Amino acid sequence: LDPFFLTNSSQIPGLLKRLDDEISSGHPTFDGFIDDLQMFQDHRSDADVVGLKAKLKHAERIDEYESAEQKKELFAKLLLRLQHYPSAQRIFALFLARINDVFEHHITPHVTDADMDRRKVDEIIESKIILPTLSDMGDGFEHFTINHAHVRGMIYWLAERCFVRWK
């Protein structure tokens, strides 16, 4: 696990504790989205390849499409269920920012490199996104856990909004 990609160890556990308190109080406390999450809610308009299916096809990953749609929807439902809790929004914003950063700096600029094949991209996604995110979440708690499918769903959700591209 690359320690550079782990969120400050105090951020996620503290946010999870606050989220547990927010949920236990019995009522959502927030309408709208915090700025850090709103940025990802809005679709980018400068993309030349639009839509998840088109992006996967362009990246020669169309075989992932059905699974990608399911995982994207799984994450979208989780986001919808927890969107009224500020701490959940902060957690999602941190994870989405990590995904965006890894793609912007470690994947997309290097797609033409000779050694940047699909396997290498998948290794980067696993080591710099999925494993650190699951590690940050720890055990989660009864109201909020994240698994591999949720994290991949976040990637596909961002791809749909034109923040992530494999090529």
Set out the residue ranges of the language-model regions.
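Long, low-complexity intrinsically disordered regions enriched in small/polar
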Residues: 1-17
